[in-house]
Amino acid sequence: MIYLYLLCAIFAEVVATSLLKSTEGFTRLWPTVGCLVGYGIAFALLALSISHGMQTDVAYALWSAIGTAAIVLVAVLFLGSPISVMKVVGVGLIVVGVVTLNLAGAH
């Protein structure tokens, strides 16, 4: 269940981050409301996953890595962001770092 909380937290964070540009500096009401609600839900669900037993370092590392990869994917597919070798390498390094952190915590 803690991983479900975390995955939902990541989803909410990705949605909120994807709305940031459309808020136009938090001057547009509904995108701003959606963005802030999304971040609120994301942090509440992250807190639930941690309070139900997930280690904070693991939760935050997974949140960061999966969230970053998902935001890059959303930005490239839906927001017109160009893809580059450096973006792919950067996301790959983040994923390798998270795997390493999780393996270190498993022993």
Curated annotation (Swiss-Prot):
GO BP terms, alphabetized: response to antibiotic; transmembrane transport
InterPro entries to which the protein is assigned, alphabetical: Small_drug/metabolite_transptr, Small_multidrug_res
GO cellular component: plasma membrane
Annotated TM spans: 2-19, 29-51, 58-80, 84-106
Signal peptide: none
A GO term, aspect molecular function: transmembrane transporter activity
Recorded family membership: Belongs to the drug/metabolite transporter (DMT) superfamily. Small multidrug resistance (SMR) (TC 2.A.7.1) family. Mmr subfamily.
The name this protein goes by in its record: Multidrug resistance protein Mmr
Organism for this UniProt entry: Mycobacterium tuberculosis (strain ATCC 25618 / H37Rv)
